[in-house]
Amino acid sequence: MTTPVLNTDFPGLKLAARGKVRDIYDLGETLLIVTTDRISAFDVIMNEGIPHKGYVLTQISAYWFRQMEDIIKNHIISTDVTDFPKECQPYADVLAGRSMWVKKAKPLAAECIVRGYISGSGWKDYQKTGAICGIKLPEGLKESDRLPQPIFTPSTKAELGTHDENISFEEMCRICGTEISTKVRDVTLAIYEKARDLADQKGIIIADTKFEYGIYDGELIIIDECMTPDSSRFWPKESYKPGGPQPSFDKQFLRDYLETLDWGKTAPAPPLPEEIVRKTGEKYMEALVKLTGKGI
């Protein structure tokens, strides 16, 4: 099995942040985002990485960013390492395929979730209240049902190791401003509807997904990642059957395994068997091939 990239360390480059998955380097006016093979579940980073996961996430993000350029600009300057600043070139072998050279935008203080199907925390909220983020939904929905129309459900941005919290659109307006929040909502729904239709043609249901936006030169742009298996629920269309959880092309396979363990869902993470690592990697790679027609 290929050795996963768990951490990066590039002498001469300034490490600005190390998130659950990405290492971000400050290049002055721009940023270098390196997507590692780290994987987290229940907000805990696992000890093992998933080989090629960083490559898969980067390539899927780049694919969707290109597809959505008619709706909104994105933060990418280039994903081709030969275009990167000269101080990055000594590390080209590690960076190739798993990194983006991006504009330095000011992130909005909310994460923007769109749901086309009812699942996960949305399903739990609906069972309790008949609504998600204050949006009333029809009675009688089953788990994994397609919603009558997609809904925009923002959340707070949590610190590493803590959980995001769903908020109402009105609360987002108070945090970010009404004008920008309205634009973000409209753009998010437009992106989702276009992506949902494109993915459907390739046998994938995008049940829900999460976006981040920023302001660059006074303009709203989309940043971070775009509709990857880490930020979305991807279901195989061929086996879709409402009324319960769905198989998926993401880390749900890992979550399901962890649910079988006597583990409190706090660090330290339990060790992962090689089979779980391998099968999780296969799920990610299958999503890349189905969406883009290309593997490694």
Swiss-Prot record:
Q: Which keywords label this protein?
A: ATP-binding, Ligase, Nucleotide-binding, Purine biosynthesis
GO CC list? cytoplasm
What InterPro entries does UniProt report for this protein, alphabetically?
SAICAR_synt/ADE2_N (IPR028923), SAICAR_synth (IPR001636)
Which SUPFAM superfamilies does the record associate with it? SAICAR synthase-like
| E.C. number | 6.3.2.6
Gene Ontology BP, a term: 'de novo' IMP biosynthetic process
Which reaction does this enzyme catalyse, per its entry? Answer: 5-amino-1-(5-phospho-D-ribosyl)imidazole-4-carboxylate + L-aspartate + ATP = (2S)-2-[5-amino-1-(5-phospho-beta-D-ribosyl)imidazole-4-carboxamido]succinate + ADP + phosphate + 2 H(+)
- Gene3D superfamilies in the cross-refs: ATP-grasp fold, B domain, Phosphorylase Kinase, domain 1
Establish whether keyword Ribonucleoprotein is in the entry.
no
Main EC class the enzyme belongs to: ligase
| MF GO annotations | ATP binding; phosphoribosylaminoimidazolesuccinocarboxamide synthase activity
The record's section on Pfam families has: SAICAR_synt
Named in its record, the pathway it takes part in is: Purine metabolism; IMP biosynthesis via de novo pathway; 5-amino-1-(5-phospho-D-ribosyl)imidazole-4-carboxamide from 5-amino-1-(5-phospho-D-ribosyl)imidazole-4-carboxylate: step 1/2
State the NCBIfam families in the record. PRK13961.1, purC
User: Could you say which protein family the record assigns here?
Assistant: Belongs to the SAICAR synthetase family.
Q: What is this protein called?
A: Phosphoribosylaminoimidazole-succinocarboxamide synthase
Question: What gene, per UniProt, encodes this protein?
Answer: purC
